[in-house]
Amino acid sequence: GFGWLLSLRESVRNDKLLAPNLYLGGPIWNGSELDWYATVVRDPERARSLVREHQAAGYDFIKVHNVLKPNVYDAILDEAKKLNIDVVGHIPHEIALSKAIASGQRTFEHLKGYYSDRSLEITKEDYVGLTKGAEVWNCPTLYTNRIGFRGDDVRTLLESDEAKYISNDERGEWLAATAGG
C-alpha cells in the first residue's frame, strides 16, 4: 500500500466514504532494489526505525518480501512485537518456515515458505505439524504464479477464464518476459 491510502481509510472510518473497512500496510519491505515498489531494508537499525515509523503512521501491518537477511528479519519481528503490529507476507529465502512461525509472522504468501524450506520432507504431516495451533494464515494465491511453478505456456494461461483477473499491464509484462524464448 501507499501513504495516500491512510487518508482514504480515514474517510471510510469517518463515514465520509462508503466502502469496506481498509486494513493497510505500507509498501512491501525487501533487501533488494529489484522490486520498484519495495522499501529497501538492509540493516537491523533501519528495520527497527521503519517499524516505528509505520506504526506511528497508522499502518495495520508490515509486509515482508523474499530478500531479507536473517538479522534484518529478526529486527523487524522483534520491533513489531514490541509495538503490537503484525508482520505478514513472504517468508524470506534465508528464513526457515519453523523460524517464521516461531517469530510471530502472521501470514505466509504463496506457500513458498513450505516448498522452499529444505529442512522439511514436504509431507502433509510437516505442513500440519508446523502450522497447527500456530495462529498463522496461509494465502496460497498460486494460480497467478503457475508459470513459475510448472512452466506453462504464457499465452495458454492468458487465454484461460481465470486470466480475466490479470491486468493488461501484467499481461504485457508476462508476454514481454517470454518473448525471447
Which residue ranges define each predicted feature?
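Active-site loop-helix segments enriched in His/Asp/Glu that coordinate
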Residues: 1-45, 59, 64-131
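Active-site neighborhoods of metal-dependent hydrolases
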Residues: 50-68, 114-181
